[in-house]
Amino acid sequence: NDDMVWQLKNKPAMEHASNLGAIIADAIAKPLGIPAFIYDGVTVDEMMPILKITGLKELSRKGIGHNLNTRAAAMKYAREHGKEYKDCKLIVVHLGGGISITLQYGGKVADIINDEDGPFAPERAGGLPSQDLIKYFGQSGMTAKEMLKKMKSRGGLVAHLGVNDSREVEKMIENGDEHAKLIYDAMALNVAR
């Protein structure tokens, strides 16, 4: 509806290409006089309220991450094993430019460790030591917008190795690059723990 389109254009929960889906659907549907629908929005927050609480009352965790991919994978798993998705208890991991780890049960994404508070990824910085991050930001001369861009698109493998493609990192390792192996192993270990 118009409220959703306004929200996505003016105050999105996060900056992401998927925000365009509802806007494009609305632009196509309105002139034709037909309804437009989106399914399984990327910012649907089903996280258990108790899991949103942090050590600062002004800040809370958000149930935003790679929900579309992880939910689809969980549903596929349930289908392939003759189960109802709502009856499954699963941990599902999305490995892409960002990494999200989800706990799914009762037909919902009940908890998520997303690319802001979890492991670093090919492009994302992941969770960082908060005091060091605050000091670094204060000394960096960057604006908040520049810092967020660095953390979202120039962190992780890009920051350490200059590439965001795991296949390139694997080639570096095959060619004997010990630093690339260390960084890749660190990323894998962060996902596993």
PLM regions: where:
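Glycine-rich phosphate-binding loop plus the immediately following alpha-helix
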Residues: 23-26, 38, 58-87, 97, ...
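Gly/Thr-rich phosphate-binding beta-strand-loop-beta motif of the actin/hexokinase/Hsp70
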Residues: 1, 88-110
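Adenine-nucleotide phosphate-binding core of ATP-dependent small-molecule kinases
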Residues: 149-193
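Short, well-ordered secondary-structure micro-motifs
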Residues: 49, 103, 159-162
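Glycine-rich phosphate-binding loop and adjoining helix at the ATP-binding site
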Residues: 2-75
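Glycine- and other small-residue-rich loops at beta-strand/loop junctions that grip anionic moieties
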Residues: 17, 62, 66, 93, ...
